[in-house]
C-alpha cells in the first residue's frame, strides 16, 4: 500500500488538476493474451471513473492453494462483467479450493487494480491515515532524478508494511471485481514457471546442454 500511495500522490501532483486513473500491476506477473487484457482494462475504466475501486480477478482453471480468492456478489450497475465483492478469502486448502472453483462464484485475487488516484487517497484517509501521512512527509523535498522521484527514506520507513488488500480493499465499500481470463500467472513457483514455458513432446521444459532419458513433465535448467 505505501508504494501505491506514493504513486497516487505523484500522479495527482503532476496531473495539472486532473484526476488520473492508476493501473496497478505487478512487475513479475505473466499475461499471455495482452490484447485481451487491455480489452478488460478498457471495459473497467468507466467504472473506475465513477469512483469504484476495481480489482481484477482471474477466472480459475483448477483448484489452486497458492492464491487468495475473491467471492463475487451482485453485478455492478447492471453490467455483466463486474461484480460487487462478497468477501476476500485467504489461501485455502485443496478441498476448499475445489469447492470454490466448482461453485463458479470465486476468482483468484490477481493483485492488479484500477482506480482514480483520488479514490485511493480518499479510502486510505479513512482506513490507514498513518500510511498516507508518512508518504506525504516523504514526498516533501523529494528530488527528481531522471525518471525517478527520490523520496525521504526516513519518513517513508515509518509506513506499516500492509498490502493494499489489508489496508484498503477489504474495508472499502467501493471495491468491485472484474473477472479476466487472459492466461495469467504470478510465476510464484517452479510448477507455474513450467506451465507457462515452451515444452517438448514429452512435456519437458529444457534449457541448456541437457541429456534426458525417459523423462516427462520436468523443468530442467542449466547454464552449461
How should these model regions be labeled?
Residues 22, 86, 105, 112-113, ...:
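A residue-level structural signature of the nucleotidyltransferase/glycosyltransferase Rossmann-like core
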Residues 68, 111-115:
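Short glycine- and hydrophobic/aromatic-rich loop-to-beta-strand nucleating segment
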Residues 25-27, 34, 57-60, 73, ...:
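Fold-independent oxyanion-binding glycine-rich loops
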Residues 115-224:
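Left-handed beta-helix
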Residues 3-6, 10, 43-46, 69, ...:
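Alpha-helical scaffold segments in soluble metabolic enzymes
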Residues 73-107:
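A short, charged helix-loop
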Residues 103-106, 110, 126-129:
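An anion/pyrophosphate-binding glycine-rich loop and adjacent beta-alpha core
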Residues 1-76, 122-127:
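Conserved beta-loop-beta/alpha segment of the NTase-like Rossmann-fold superfamily
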Amino acid at each position: 500500500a505505501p508504494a501505491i500511495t506514493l504513486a497516487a500522490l505523484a500522479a495527482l501532483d503532476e496531473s495539472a488538476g486532473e484526476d488520473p486513473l492508476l493501473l496497478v500491476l505487478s512487475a513479475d506477473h505473466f499475461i499471455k493474451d495482452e490484447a485481451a487484457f487491455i480489452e478488460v482494462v478498457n471495459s473497467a475504466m468507466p467504472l473506475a471513473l465513477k469512483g469504484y475501486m476495481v480489482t481484477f480477478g482471474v477466472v480459475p482453471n483448477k483448484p489452486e492453494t497458492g492464491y487468495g480468492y475473491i467471492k463475487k456478489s451482485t453485478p455492478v450497475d447492471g453490467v455483466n462483467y463486474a461484480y460487487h465483492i462478497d468477501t476476500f478469502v485467504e489461501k485455502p486448502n485443496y478441498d476448499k479450493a475445489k469447492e470454490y472453483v466448482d461453485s463458479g462464484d470465486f476468482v483468484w485475487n490477481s493483485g492488479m487494480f484500477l482506480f482514480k488516484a483520488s479514490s485511493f487517497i480518499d479510502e486510505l484517509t479513512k482506513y490507514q491515515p498513518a500510511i498516507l501521512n508518512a508518504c506525504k512527509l516523504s514526498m516533501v523535498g523529494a528530488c527528481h532524478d531522471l525518471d525517478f522521484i527520490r523520496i525521504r527514506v526516513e519518513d517513508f520507513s515509518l509506513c506499516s508494511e500492509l498490502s493494499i488488500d489489508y489496508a484498503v480493499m477489504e474495508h472499502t465499500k467501493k471495491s468491485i471485481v472484474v473477472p479476466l481470463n487472459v492466461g495469467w500467472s504470478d510465476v510464484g513457483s517452479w510448477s507455474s514457471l513450467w506451465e507457462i514455458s515452451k515444452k517438448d513432446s514429452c512435456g519437458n521444459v529444457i534449457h541448456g546442454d541437457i541429456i534426458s532419458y525417459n523423462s516427462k513433465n520436468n523443468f530442467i535448467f542449466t547454464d552449461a
